[in-house]
């Protein structure tokens, strides 16, 4: 949740909402007002622009995040790989879209998932696509995600 909030802070150029888990929503008035208040970081918003541009270029120009491209949407993203001394590396991906006036910020972390682009990115990208378009237009990626071999080895103690 904190990584998704980080993606939201970058997407919003410095502000965030208090992250929380919602069990159910019974109308906008049912949530505490504090969840609608913007909280600002101490970072000047101008410093977010190079980060946003780099995340946009990583998806749309070239880099490890190009599989996250969505037609008609300016997606921004960053893959990550966390080394794991006891098995496969952990796969991470942070993303938001669109670049300006974002509607979604997402983070996916897959233990033992390998490189960021191999597990976390396709999962996040499909979730983002469905949220933004109400459909999945990349059946090959969906099939790939369905067939991911994510394992959790029994670690020696």
Question: How should each PLM-predicted stretch be described?
Answer:
Residues 1-39, 46, 55-138:
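Active-site beta-strand/loop architecture of penicillin-binding DD-peptidases
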Residues 138-157:
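Short, highly charged C-terminal tails/helix-capping segments
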